[in-house]
């Protein structure tokens, strides 16, 4: 969650609390029920930090597909490469042109890295599937940019604990089907970019699809997120 003033970010992925340059954030992560039952590692990854312009904060999150070989490694490869692009950015005013340029650079870098990973490990590139959620905010202007491929969600929570969904999960013919960074048509059908401005004293939640399963997280979420439908 990201909160204006002392911006607060809850990237649901690790169970720790931090204070990072005008922004407080919590990270929580836990393997899902199916994963625990079958001895599968947690396949989510997250990176948070500030760009060269320290007024800009980012949260990058990825979920490796369960059927994907080396799913955890693929998720970390996804967020690590996204972070390399975001860290060097310095945007005083977030706009559509910058957003499209950054999103394209990130996706191309992720795909190139996954392709090299596939060659090195004798794997099929088409099976190295991962989602991507990026929330990037200028802490002074409160302007934000969201880059989203696949499921997961981003929501803005105000002082009264009501939610405005900023980015919904994207699913296909069934709720279990989603889109990934390595899809052939990722730029035309899968990549979504949104812009806006966060209100004062509000928070932002960034989460993978696991947010619906983890009851210890789910029970504290505003009901609007609980009722969110896959689209």
Name each model-derived stretch.
Residues 2-231:
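PP2C/PPM-type serine/threonine phosphatase catalytic domain
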